[in-house]
Amino acid sequence: MKGRPNVLAIVLAGGEGKRLFPLTEDRAKPAVPFGGTYRLIDFVLSNLVNSGFLKIAVLTQYKSHSLDRHISLSWNVSGPTGQYIASVPAQQRLGKRWFTGSADAILQSLNLISDEKPDYVIVFGADHVYRMDPSQMLDEHIASGRAVSVAGIRVPREEATAFGCIQSDVDGNITEFLEKPADPPGTPDDPDMTYASMGNYIFTTEALIQALKDDENNENSDHDMGGDIIPYFVSRNDAHVYDFSGNIVPGATERDKGYWRDVGTIDAFYECHMDLISVHPIFNLYNSEWPIHTTSEGNLPPAKFVRGGIAQSSMVSSGSIISAGTVRNSVLSNNVVVEEGATVEGAVLMPGVRIGKGAVVRHAILDKNVVVRDGELIGVDQVRDAQRFKVSAGGVVVVGKNQVV
């Protein structure tokens, strides 16, 4: 857009991610590796950067070392025009306490807003997999004249009970914001679909500051953006829904247009990986017109297949070696080794994993640097797996970081 206003983007990256345990045992949820070479936070940061928003504060808290390191190594966009992507930990500016909720995180970081003096503040989550052009949402927010716009994705009503749900009128004004309702509202044009909140918001700055200060003094508040701040604006008839289905990203196909996944559970995380590996994937990582950025792999050699090693319907990242082993329907991160006679099927292997000779790994997620001994079986005997590892409701076996099994 011409004459773009001053915008500050705040990414909420302090999530603990308990439902992704043990993948979050030693790292914040946005730092969890994803898709072979990425981390979850790379998706929101790529969307913002590709859209031209280059003043970004990433608010961190929970076990943030690997996240902070990733941002400093992969996202150095500083320049003479004041652009930056900065990791901002909890600083206890309002007393000796950590962030008590997502709204409190922004309240404690109001100095960032004071320094930048933005016209609008983008507040996005850090742990979803999707492509989006936020500038289109900003344009619609400005045109709406409302204090806040909430990105909504259309989902079938029967699936919407797990989300914050938006009821709106035909003009996009939000009339009610419901947290995980038993009977989700339909959209104005389709009673069988519901607007689920994506956790992405754009605020007019003055209105956001006032809402945060009012919320601070509310003893009954949980200080949560979705649970408290958005209803605050809805009650004042000052909230607008942005229909994500209208967001057109360059290079998107009809197959992956509107793709958005909340990967907050092991099963959702696993299924999202499986979305990547079909011939015509539901979510296409190879869209060069709207790339997902991350650390360069320039110092790693290409993946190598030797002694008859094969990979079918899989993604195999740089530095990996398949030596007389077989990989099917799987996603392998950097520096994975699959040895002679080993079989990996329907698995997600994170960096540095070693699969020993004759071992079998099926329907599993193996975190960084896991070593599977020769002849070991994972994902074959559910009873034995449950005695040793976490097994999700969908039967996905998860082996935590640095284990030798």
Swiss-Prot record:
It comes from the Bacteria. InterPro entries: ADP-Glc_PPase (IPR011831), ADP_Glu_pyroP_CS (IPR005836), GlgC_bac (IPR023049), GlmU/GlgC-like_hexapep (IPR056818), NTP_transferase_dom (IPR005835), Nucleotide-diphossugar_trans (IPR029044), Trimer_LpxA-like_sf (IPR011004). GO terms for biological process: glycogen biosynthetic process. Pathway: Glycan biosynthesis; glycogen biosynthesis. Gene3D superfamilies: Hexapeptide repeat proteins, Spore Coat Polysaccharide Biosynthesis Protein SpsA, Chain A. SUPFAM superfamilies: Nucleotide-diphospho-sugar transferases, Trimeric LpxA-like enzymes. The keyword Heme does not apply. Belongs to the bacterial/plant glucose-1-phosphate adenylyltransferase family. This is Glucose-1-phosphate adenylyltransferase. It comes from Corynebacterium glutamicum (strain ATCC 13032 / DSM 20300 / JCM 1318 / BCRC 11384 / CCUG 27702 / LMG 3730 / NBRC 12168 / NCIMB 10025 / NRRL B-2784 / 534).
